[in-house]
Amino acid sequence: MAKTNIKPIMPSLREKKRYLAFEAITNSQIDFKKAKEDISNAFIDLHGTLGTSKIAPMFLENKWNNASKTGIIKIGHKHVDDMKAAFAIAGSDKIIYKSLGVSGILKKAESKFIKKSG
């Protein structure tokens, strides 16, 4: 049987991505795993498992800054408001998650919203 190659999706048909910068406001130290778990659980509570799988948020671990407790999430452009809504119910009494801003370019989101330590 002949092997057929699947054509890649044209750029105009691909989902456009956005980079959402966020901050964890807390007095104690928080790591990437805890922040990802809190936000993911809130997102699942809000949109369900099926909604979360369709939206497919991607947490960028290498963009997490422990000193400023800030990070970046890659998400589709249609679902930015859904992610911001999940921030409202994420965390606990001692942790608040806040959206810092949205950008279409990762480098710009990092330079504009993520504070560098040192």
Q: Residue locations for each model-derived region?
A:
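Long, charge-dense
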Residues: 90-118
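Helix N-cap motif at beta-to-alpha junctions
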Residues: 74-81
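Beta-strand cores of modular interaction/reader domains in eukaryotic scaffold and signaling proteins
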Residues: 23, 72-74, 98
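Surface-exposed, low-hydrophobicity interaction/linker segments
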Residues: 23-63, 106-109, 113-117
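N-terminal, charge-rich interaction modules
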Residues: 1-29
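The conserved glycine-aromatic submotif of the RRM
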Residues: 63-72
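Short amphipathic alpha-helices in soluble, non-transmembrane regions
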Residues: 83-90
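Broad gene-expression machinery/nucleic-acid interaction feature
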Residues: 17-19, 70, 94-96
